[in-house]
Amino acid sequence: MFLFSSRRITSLRSYTIIKHSSCYSTLVSDGNIFSIQHFQSLMQKYESNLKIIHQLHSHFTTSGFLLLHQKQNSGKLFLFNPLLRCYSLGETPLHAYFLYDQLQRLHFLSDHNKSLPPFDSFTYLFLLKASSNPRFPSLLLGIGLHGLTLKLGFESHVYVQTALVGMYLVGGNMIDAHKVFDEMPERNPVTWNVMITGLTNLGDFEKALCFLEKMPNRTVVSWTTIIDGYARVDKPKEAILLFSRMVACDAIKPNEITILAILPAVWNLGDLKMCGSVHAYVGKRGFVPCDIRVTNSLIDAYAKCGCIQSAFKFFIEIPNGRKNLVSWTTMISAFAIHGMGKEAVSMFKDMERLGLKPNRVTMISVLNACSHGGLAEEEFLEFFNTMVNEYKITPDVKHYGCLVDMLRRKGRLEEAEKIALEIPIEEKAVVWRMLLGACSVYDDAELAERVTRKLMELERSHGGDYVLMSNIFCGTGRFLDAQRFRKQMDVRGVAKLPGHSQVT
C-alpha cells in the first residue's frame, strides 16, 4: 500500500479550488503511484469529467501502476470497471474497448500464464452497454462479446443477458433479442423493461404491449415507457388510453416521469378537460408542490390547450422561490403562443428584476412574443441587442428566424432577404423557407425565385419548397413556370409528404 506525503495530501485537497485537469497533472507529474483507494475516490468524484477520466485511463495503463498491483486482482477490477462504466455510458463508448484491449495486453505481459485476464461479469456488462450506446452503437462488437460471454460461462448472469437483449434491440435485431430473452434461466423486472423499451423504440407497440401483459410484476417504468413512446411518435390518443388504464390499475400508480410523458400527448390533442383531470390527479398525489418539472409542464400544457388564463393562474400561485428559469421561459412562451406580446415582455422584465439571467431558449420565446404580438420593431431589436451585448448569447438560426419573421409580418421582405443573406450560420434553410412562405402571402414571385434558388443550394430534397414555389407561380398567373417546377420535382425524385389532420 502506497501512502501520500503531506505535500501530496495538500495537493489533493486543492482539487476544490484549482482546475481539475491542472491539479491532476500536479499529482502525477513526479511519477509517484496512486494507491488503489485514492484511484477509487478519484473515479467516484470525477466520473462525469471526461478529461480527467482520460487522464486516469492513461495513468492506469502506462505508469506502471497496474504492474505494481498485479497481485491484487480484485483491486484491478475495482479500478478497471468504474473506468469502463464511465466510457460505456458517456460520449466516447469506443474508449471502453480500447481500455479493455490495453488491459488484456498488460495482463499477458505481466503474467507468466496466458489465462484470460481476471475480468468479471460487470466488465462484460459495461462493454455490452458500450456497444449499445446510442451515440456509437456497434452490433458487430456486441455479437463478438456475446460469444465471449458464453465462453466465460456468463449465460446464467441475469444482468449480462439483459445487456445482450438491449444490445440486440438497439441494433434492430429483434430475432436474436427474443432468442436471448427466451433462453434466459432467470429474468428480473429490468430484463422485461429493457425488452419493452427496445420494442417501443423500434415502433413495435403491439409486441411491447404483449410483453407488458405477460410481465409477471409490472413496474411504473413498464407503463411509462410505452406511454412516452406513443407520445413521441404522435399517437396521443393511444398514450392517453394507456395512461387511463394505468391509473385504473390499483397496483401501479404513475410517478412524476409518467406525468411528464403524458402531458405532451394531452396538449397535442388540445384536450383541456384531460389537462384539468391530469392536474387534479397530480395535485391529489402531491406531485405539484414537490416537482417543479411537473409544474412547468402543466403550465405549458394549459397554454397549448388554449387556456392561457389557467396557465397564468397556475404560474402566479407558485412562490417565486420555487420558480426556476424554465418556469419563466414556459410562461413567456405561453404568452407568445397566444400573441400576447406585451404580457410576455412584462413577464421577461419581472424575471430580470428577480436576478434570473435568460438563456437562448428564453430569448427565442421573448423574440417570438415580440414578433407574434405585433410589437414595435425598436422593442424587438432592443431585446436582440440585449441578448448579444448584455447576456453574451450568440444568436443561432432560431434567433435569426425570429428577426426574419418579424420583418415578413410587416411586409418588409427585401429587408428580411438581406438578413437571411447575412446570417453566419450554415443551417439556415429554415429561415429561407420562412421567407418563401411570406412570398406566398404577398404574391412576390420575383423574390420567391431568388429564395428558392438559395434553398436549392442548401437542400434539394424538400418537396414542400417545390410545391410552394409552384403555387406562387400559379397565384401570379405563371402556369408554365409552375409546371416546370413540378417536373423538376419528379425528375429529382422528390416526394411531398401528405398532410394529415387529427380533426374527426
UniProtKB/Swiss-Prot annotation:
Residue ranges, annotated region (Type E motif): 431-504
PPR repeat residue numbers: 76-110, 120-156, 157-187, 188-222, 223-253, 255-289, 291-321, 324-358, 359-390, 396-430
InterPro entries documented for this protein: E_motif (IPR046848), Pentatricopeptide_rpt (IPR002885), PPR_At4g14850-like_plant (IPR046960), TPR-like_helical_dom_sf (IPR011990)
Pfam families with a match to the protein in the record: E_motif, PPR, PPR_2
GO cellular component: cytosolic ribosome; mitochondrion
Keywords, ordered alphabetically: Mitochondrion, Repeat, Transit peptide
Domain of life of the organism encoding this protein: Eukaryota
Biological-process GO terms, alphabetical: RNA modification
Family of the protein in this entry: Belongs to the PPR family. PCMP-E subfamily.
Transit peptide per record: 1-87
MF terms in GO: RNA binding
Subcellular location as annotated: Mitochondrion
Protein's name in the database: Pentatricopeptide repeat-containing protein At1g09220, mitochondrial
Disulfide bridge map: none
